């Protein structure tokens, strides 16, 4: 299992950063996501399910993303999602925003990638922690970059 927790401060309002995580804007921060369609409940509800299609090179992967936790208050916003990728990995992601002041937001990105079968566990053991850290850092940079455009 791979786990991570990283945080950064973004020089803009919590509302602007949070808007990037709305369904209509998700492709801005996750450019490899080609489809993100709500199929159950409302996007701001625990238990909401989305059909998501992700492109990795020439390969397309489609899976169901379930919202496990959702909080939207003035000073803190949090969303936790989970999905199984390629029948091999169970991925859980948590995006937390904490209002520091009117123009600064703490962004915390944490998650875990767990092998659900022998192939998944073997691939995680063979994978590089360095490359996973790079993906996490690139995502955080992308969120920061997109937030500054708003």
Write out the residue ranges for each language-model feature.
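Hydrophobic ligand-binding cavity/cleft-lining segments
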Residues: 1-45
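Short, surface-exposed coil-to-beta transition loops
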Residues: 2-5, 60-65, 88-94
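Generic structural detector for well-ordered beta-strands
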Residues: 7-11, 37, 53, 66, ...
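Short strand-connecting beta-turns/loops that link adjacent beta-strands
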Residues: 13, 43, 72-73, 100-103
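Hydrophobic pocket/interface hotspot
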Residues: 16-21, 26, 50, 67, ...
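Short acidic, gly/pro-rich beta-turn/loop elements at beta-sheet edges
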Residues: 16-18, 29, 60-62, 75, ...
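Glycine-rich portal/gate segments that line the openings of hydrophobic small-molecule binding cavities
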Residues: 38-86, 138-150
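Beta-strand/loop substructures that line and gate deep hydrophobic ligand-binding cavities in soluble
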Residues: 82-137
């Amino acid at each position: 299992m791979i786990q991570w927790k990283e945080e950064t401060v973004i020089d803009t309002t919590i509302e602007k950063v949070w808007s990037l995580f709305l369904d209509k804007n998700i492709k801005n921060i996750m450019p490899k996501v080609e489809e993100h369609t709500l199929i159950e409940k409302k996007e701001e509800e625990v238990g909401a399910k989305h059909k998501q299609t992700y492109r990795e090179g020439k390969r397309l992967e489609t899976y169901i993303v379930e919202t496990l936790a959702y909080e939207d208050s003035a000073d803190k916003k949090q969303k936790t999602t989970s999905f199984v990728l390629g029948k091999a990995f169970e991925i859980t992601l948590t995006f937390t925003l904490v209002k520091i002041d009117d123009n600064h937001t703490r962004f915390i990105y944490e998650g875990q990638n767990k092998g659900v079968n022998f192939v998944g566990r073997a691939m995680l053991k063979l994978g590089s922690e360095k490359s996973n850290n790079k993906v996490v850092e690139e995502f955080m940079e992308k969120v920061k970059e997109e937030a500054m455009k708003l």
